[in-house]
From Swiss-Prot:
Family designation: Belongs to the immunoglobulin superfamily.
Domain Ig-like C2-type: 39-144, 149-247, 256-347, 354-448, 454-554, 558-649, 754-846, 852-953
MF GO annotations: alpha-actinin binding; cell adhesion molecule binding; protein domain specific binding; spectrin binding
Summary of the tissues where the protein is detected: Strongly expressed in the podocytes of kidney glomeruli (at protein level) and at lower levels in the spleen.
Chain positions found as Phosphotyrosine: Y1204
Protein name, as recorded: Nephrin
Family matches, as SMART domains: FN3, IG, IGc2
Residue numbers bearing the Phosphothreonine modification: T1115
Presence of keyword Heme: no
Phosphoserine carried by residues: S446, S1112, S1119
CDD domains reported for this sequence: FN3, Ig
Organism from which the protein derives: Rattus norvegicus
Subunit structure: Interacts with NPHS2 and with CD2AP (via C-terminal domain). Self-associates (via the Ig-like domains). Also interacts (via the Ig-like domains) with KIRREL1/NEPH1 and KIRREL2; the interaction with KIRREL1 is dependent on KIRREL1 glycosylation. Interacts with KIRREL3. Interacts with MAGI1 (via PDZ 2 and 3 domains) forming a tripartite complex with IGSF5/JAM4. Interacts with DDN; the interaction is direct. Forms a complex with ACTN4, CASK, IQGAP1, MAGI2, SPTAN1 and SPTBN1. Interacts with phosphatidylinositol 3-kinase regulatory subunit PIK3R1; the interaction is reduced by high glucose levels.
Sugar-bearing residue positions: N54, N370, N561, N578, N591, N722
Amino acid sequence: MGAKRVTVRGARTSPIHRMSSLTPLLLMGMLTSGLAESPVPTSAPRGFWALSENLTAVEGTTVKLWCGVRAPGSVVQWAKDGLLLGPNPKMPGFPRYSLEGDRAKGEFHLLIEACDLSDDAEYECQVGRSELGPELVSPKVILSILVSPKVLLLTPEAGSTVTWVAGQEYVVTCVSGDAKPAPDITFIQSGRTILDVSSNVNEGSEEKLCITEAEARVIPQSSDNGQLLVCEGSNPALDTPIKASFTMNILFPPGPPVIDWPGLNEGHVRAGENLELPCTARGGNPPATLQWLKNGKPVSTAWGTEHAQAVAHSVLVMTVRPEDHGARLSCQSYNSVSAGTQERSITLQVTFPPSAITILGSVSQSENKNVTLCCLTKSSRPRVLLRWWLGGRQLLPTDETVMDGLHGGHISMSNLTFLVRREDNGLPLTCEAFSDAFSKETFKKSLTLNVKYPAQKLWIEGPPEGQYIRTGTRVRLVCLAIGGNPDPSLIWFKDSRPVSEPRQPQEPRRVQLGSVEKSGSTFSRELVLIIGPPDNRAKFSCKAGQLSASTQLVVQFPPTNLTILANSSALRPGDALNLTCVSISSNPPVNLSWDKEGERLEDVAAKPQSAPFKGSAASRSVFLRVSSRDHGQRVTCRAHSEALRETVSSFYRFNVLYPPEFLGEQVRAVTVVEQGQVLLPVSVSANPAPEAFNWTFRGYRLSPAGGPRHRILSGGALQLWNVTRADDGFYQLHCQNSEGTAEALLKLDVHYAPTIRALRDPTEVNVGGSVDIVCTVDANPILPEMFSWERLGEEEEDLNLDDMEKVSKGSTGRLRIRQAKLSQAGAYQCIVDNGVAPAARGLVRLVVRFAPQVDQPTPLTKVAAAGDSTSSATLHCRARGVPNIDFTWTKNGVPLDLQDPRYTEHRYHQGVVHSSLLTIANVSAAQDYALFKCTATNALGSDHTNIQLVSISRPDPPLGLKVVSISPHSVGLEWKPGFDGGLPQRFQIRYEALETPGFLHVDVLPTQATTFTLTGLKPSTRYRIWLLASNALGDSGLTDKGIQVSVTTPGPDQAPEDTDHQLPTELPPGPPRLPLLPVLFAVGGLLLLSNASCVGGLLWRRRLRRLAEEISEKTEAGSEDRIRNEYEESQWTGDRDTRSSTVSTAEVDPNYYSMRDFSPQLPPTLEEVLYHQGAEGEDMAFPGHLHDEVERAYGPPGAWGPLYDEVRMDPYDLRWPEVQCEDPRGIYDQVAADMDAVEASSLPFELRGHLV
């Protein structure tokens, strides 16, 4: 909120008189609006025409104190409590103070922004002595700052809810924050101002500030519940008072409870009704707690509250019972501040009928006899009357009696005696209770009269006697009787014993005894039988009282039991056995016979025996001699009945004791794959079962309890897991039981994946020689076609093995190579697959030894260096060959003395690539500008290349400028850079249209590009195009052969010749606006040449000297950085050195190709690797690609990298792991010096020893 500005002015002029009368009103307006303007006195002191009077301002407003000086040229400043504020309008040290007004008019008003309590002081306007007047000091002006209270601290805490009890006295305190003047504090309770307030004014936290502490005494009433108690603070600095308040929660007791009885007769209710009594209590904070009591005991403590209306509800729900008669129901209400409980009660008057009627005495009696009965009711209110009914006829009671009952009720009793007759049988006998109080209800008790008399006739219905019934037939016998009460019981008997159903559920349900059924006056009971042998000739009878009837059944049944008896229980091979078959009982008699496994046996008859169930018995015997093959076989006895056409059989199983015998299906050989599991099965027969199975392998017994890799199963089989090839062999099994022993021999054939045991790596051969790559494996099984060979490489066309012979015999495979060629060198993989995964893979390198081949892309190579004896030059000679190569150097045909300190040679070996770097220090034009020859030699021959060391010069013209694409408006160009003279070079294209005079020039960007698309051409126009190379020493000239080309653009309708080239383009400058522009350029050039001819020589010599000095300084101080840049440029097209370069001459053209942009696809050389790693701790540097090779006809660049890749093979597993199949170009990126801590088996091939 921005500060408010107050302006105070005053002078002894007419405006001052007009304002003075309004001063009180202005002051009031300023205090209420936040603006403070100093009143101006009616008369100003001498020397002043306007001064402020005392002023009061609110904190945070802007105040202006007026000071009008009659001598404008004087130095005027203000003083605050005697402290001079200075004449500077900005008043350093007082950022809120400043002087305002027109000094020429003598206005020096003090403006105070955002005033605070520190500005409450006395101020003087002081005028310094000047030519126009003496020193002057104004009267003191007092500035009073009003500070409003920022906060009120209320106790209890503001914003909270305070709980009080109505009628009690409480103290509330309110403390204001710092203010000036002291604020006034007022308390407001529920909208009413509290008068009983005491206040104290105390010093504030700072000087001139005050705080007010007020205390009020409050006696709350119930009407204050939910209202606010507010503390208001005010002082002149506030537009509106500040407030703090809390909410009063007043506790007071509720009103009395009220019960709302449903109906007019309070307390009268009938038993069985669901009574709902609501009880309500109004008012109270907290709302009332309600509970119901019955005869002084709580029955319900559940209630609900409507807080908005402060009403508590509780409903008593009960089912009225007779015992509730006279009960007192009470509803009580109270809360936490109640002095006691308030209660409302109701007494119940319960009406209830008799809960039951009982008839005492027996209603069963023989005909023509008296029956005496008594009818008795339960207690009722009011009493009831009784009457008797027999069917629809009322009977008169003998006497009636009334007695007192429970719960204030009465008991009624009536006695009755009458004579029973046969026709009264089955009639209902009823005792009825009635009363006027229960007019709509009837209460009665009924019994059925039972008059007893006997049955008249009894008989049985079923199969006729003497009829044959087959066993298992379902027979139904029915016993019938007429008349009788009670109903005849109809009891069945079998041979004088009562018939009953089986009691056990598991017994076969052969007898089903029905219940007595009644149809009119006829009674029946059914007996269903599943006929069996025990029913043969049995007598079945039915009885009802003194009456009885019977019948007899004849049953046909096969042998009830066929038993085989043996003369011996323990049999051994060769023992004699006598078996007897006995048929216990059958009807009619049966024929017996014997057979063994379907073969009929001769038998003899035995002595007959008596038979149960009134049937016939039979027996026959057979004689046998047993063997071990009979064990478990059966001999069967068959009993056949012709009449029944049924045969009953029984068998005897041989139990022959004999020692173990191995069966014919016993397996003798088992095959398993290594690391798998196998089961050696056992097929043995023995009785008793073998007591032990003992396995031995190679003379060692296997533990019967099992081991880490074997377990003997309960059947004797041997289970092996994690089988290894060491488990291959014969296993002997020894079986034993109590009768003897037996042995068997089983062979385990373990198949395992092949493992390469011998693979000569590397395998060496001279070019044109013959060699066998031999691969020897350990495998099982050995298969004729398990060997295969692969050649590893990047070019698919170089990987076929059609020119090689594959031979295998047993565990050895051979790849036979005849007339070896260089192209056959490289990595070969022997793959062995015998059907057990995984296949074995072994990597072997074929090293084809050949004579040195020096990389010499052109007949002559040039290296540029300054010949001022301050710079150095490096000659790079690289050759390929196996075995190792030795280098020699000559200069102009004379062997170079490498003992000369100016010559330093470094040699590096990377696979088949060998390098020699010759560094010449302090190059001298007289001594070192010569033709150097590098010769590479090994045991198979030698080769050489020539390198010419020349001076730094202008670049050679580019070569091979040709058109690669053409369109109506553009021409695509391509060329080869020439020798750059040892300095960075750039290219410029000059072209002209033959029909239009004048030339146009275009700079090629980027500067290293060797392709460019010239655009902005006209269709159907012939152009002549030149290519120019330049460096810091000049350009290559335009008159040399092969740097210009003529071309005619096609018409707009013709298709472009080649659209496949995507070359960098740059729009050439547009055609000159004036045709004479080329002429003007030519004239200007002549004028410049005439002026420059005088100083050309001097500048040329100074430039050469400067270049030489720079080369010398950078050679001595930063040779390593310079050489690294050259290496990085060659390898990654980085920054280039400007003082040395390597170029090679063209084969036909005498011009030179620049080697800076030539990057053959070869693996990094060993010296390049050592350049980054350092060599033997020597602090030196050498160039990377100072002399780069150009592709030769014998193979593409990079083809040498993977030919001699290292093979890393585990001594125990010669298979080539997939994780070791790395990029072959990175195998030789280390040197032996850096590998002292590496195991010998992990060294690259060429570092394990020489090939010769």
